[in-house]
Amino acid sequence: MNDILKYLLRSHILLAIYSFFFLYGLYFEYPSSWVYALMISFGIIGIYNLHRLWKFKMGRLPNSINDWTVLNKKSIYVLALIPTLMAMLLYFWLYSFDQLQNILTVFCVLTSVFYVKRIGKFALREIPYLKVFFVIAIWYLLFFIYPYWIFDSPQPWILGFLFLMSILIPSDIKDIYFDPHEMRTIPQVVGIEKSVKLIQLVL
């Protein structure tokens, strides 16, 4: 794989770019939608790289990702800290005036922290059968519920859920050889072939 493309993928910059254009494409008719999309993109880069650093510290990365992290640790620290701070500043400046929204934001933050940090035996991502649903819950809030509040935008609620499921199950397929079997992710339970058929059915 090209080194630049590998870096963009593994640092989650590419995911953040795609998320920016997806969000902006959904809500472009609202004047501040690009700012919201930018905030979410900063958050994606920051949180995912904080996850990477935590799992690196705990020795829970696959060997190939661990070796890549060793080589790029300084830049990953930058990507973990600066975008997270930028996302926080944008949120408190523009979007922190609704109490229920703030409560759900705290839920998102705590879920993101304990998604990788273990309490006792499990982190949230390691609870059997639930990994993909924690991720769907966060992305659903960010991509559909918050924009509904902020922009008063009508939402395709069911289609939005099905869309997120169809793009997040492949992440579990990618991790099937790294996730402990006890996690019981969808591909582990039904197999890769049936997982692909489920995605096709949803789409």
Provide a role label for each language-model segment.
Residues M1-Y7, I119-F122:
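Short, Lys/Arg-rich, polar N-terminal cytosolic tail immediately upstream
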Residues K6-Y27, L81-T84, I136-L142:
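The first (N-terminal) embedded transmembrane alpha-helix
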Residues F20, Y24, I40-W54, M86-M88, ...:
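Central hydrophobic cores of alpha-helical transmembrane segments in multi-pass inner-membrane proteins
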Residues Y24-V35, F92-S96, I150:
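Short, hydrophobic transmembrane alpha-helix segments
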Residues Y30-L50, L104-T111, D152-P170:
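Membrane-embedded alpha-helical segments that form the functional core of polytopic membrane enzymes
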Residues I44-P83, M165-V202:
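Solvent-exposed interhelical
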Residues W68-I150:
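Intramembrane alpha-helical segments
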Residues V132-I176:
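Functional transmembrane core segments of multi-pass inner-membrane proteins
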